[in-house]
Amino acid sequence: PVKPRYEFKRTARGDGETFDVTDVKCPDVTAAYRLFKQREIASDLKETVCRLSDSSYDDAANQNMPSMQYELPDGNVIDVGVERYKIPELLFQPELVGSFGLGGDAPDLKNAKGLSQLVLENINRCDVDVRKDLFGGMLLAGGGSLFPQLRERLEAELHDAAPTNVRVKVTASQNAIERKFATWIGGSILASLGSFQQMWMSKQEYEEH
């Protein structure tokens, strides 16, 4: 038999009578599936209400920022306050995770490097001849890039750190779906090209090398 892998936690009303479904749990909902759904909700919350500060996070300046409401799948509405600035700030200043009270089970991030520092270091590891092109041709992709103000913040920090004669340009699709799944979209376009068969390596060739 096909067993549903979901659960209901709300009240459903029909004509003439009310059915209270308060906590009906399907016995076959695995812990892994429950964790997957929890992370899916957390990702949506992150991409919906969180945003980067224009410059390095300042606790005093952000305390008066208005909170935003987020509706959970069960209908409950929560207010997200200054945390909506703190969470994305960890991309640039991961060492603040402890002072933000967001540590939990997170690994020690004292020596972790921020996004702009990682980008700068990787560009500087490349040949001098291509660095100018790399600074001027950065593309944001993936779900983590959906934070509002991320592109502007990254571009500003790299501009301050880059050589004075280099133009820094960070681009990102305005379409959230395209940005989130850019790698898959790019892969599908590449795979559809007639010349793609000349680019791949067979299993036999791979094993030979």
Task: Provide a role label for each language-model segment.
Residues 1-209:
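C-terminal region/appendage detector
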